[in-house]
Regions:
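N-terminal non-catalytic accessory region
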Residues: 1-164
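Helical cap/lid subdomain of alpha/beta-hydrolase-fold lipid enzymes
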Residues: 117, 126-250
């Protein structure tokens, strides 16, 4: 194994990728620092669950179509497949012999831990294992949940987003803007929620569109960023995710 394994940086809640928000750089001068290590900046759903973000991250690293998992997609009520990164992977030969360093900020922390869990269970049938990740580094990582989620409308007892909450209103405002701009905003800031069907249908009025979005299961279940960041969500994830002796954790 090379001692110059690639580094992949994963943004947090409401974060953005290198092709969004013009000159703004989520990682500051990180890519200007001289280093022999190849570095890549991922772009995953800023409002998506740790699981969905991990699936999007895996596809970007490997260069494959996003696969959220057949059982997961059926249970949560969204499409199984997402964007196709075939031929565009950061590390096409990603494997145990060519592992990566993962760096996650905020929600990026549970995202990269979830990714290693899925790799350890060969979730995508690539013949993967936990050793595809040589190190996991978290920066202000939300590893045990955050009480801030309850201020945004998560129920303190269940962790689920309340029907009338700031989070729900924010989502509707975002989607109304997306409708009004005809999707142009995706080139500026992409919420990556296409697998939930948040795409304007031909001939659909704004009222019909918002009604459909409001009825989506996205904020009614556990497959969203808000739940992933609650104490309940973190507790459930930490009960399943493991650490592995061949991986460095910081």
């Amino acid at each position: 194994m090379s001692n110059q394994c690639p580094v992949v940086l994963v943004h947090g809640l409401l974060g953005f990728g290198p092709k969004e928000l013009g000159p703004l750089n989520y990682w500051g001068a990180a890519f200007k620092v001289l280093s022999p290590l190849p570095r890549y900046e991922a772009s995953v759903g800023p409002l998506s669950s740790a699981h969905d973000r991990a699936c999007e991250l895996a596809a970007q690293i490997k260069g494959a179509r996003v696969d959220y998992g057949e059982e997961h997609a059926r249970r949560e009520g969204h499409k199984r497949f997402g964007f196709d990164f075939s031929g565009k992977g950061f590390v096409p030969h990603w494997s145990e012999r060519c592992p990566v360093h993962l760096v996650g900020h905020s929600l990026g922390s549970p995202t990269i831990r979830c990714l290693q869990h899925l790799l350890a269970n060969d979730y995508w049938g690539w013949g993967s294992n936990a050793s595809w990740v040589v190190s996991i580094t978290t920066i202000s990582g939300v590893s045990n949940g955050s009480t801030l989620t309850y201020l945004f409308g998560a129920d303190e007892r269940t962790g689920l987003v309340k029907k009338a909450s700031l989070t729900t209103l924010l989502l509707l405002a975002v989607e109304a803007y997306g409708y009004a701009t005809g999707g142009v905003q995706d080139a500026i800031y992409n919420f990556d929620l296409n697998h939930w069907g948040f795409t304007r249908a031909a001939g659909e009025t704004v009222g019909e569109y918002l009604v459909r979005v409001s009825r989506s299961r996205f904020l009614k279940g556990k497959d969203n960023a808000c739940y992933s960041l609650t104490l309940q969500g973190a507790y459930a994830d930490n009960a399943v995710w493991q650490t592995y002796p061949e991986t460095y954790y910081l």
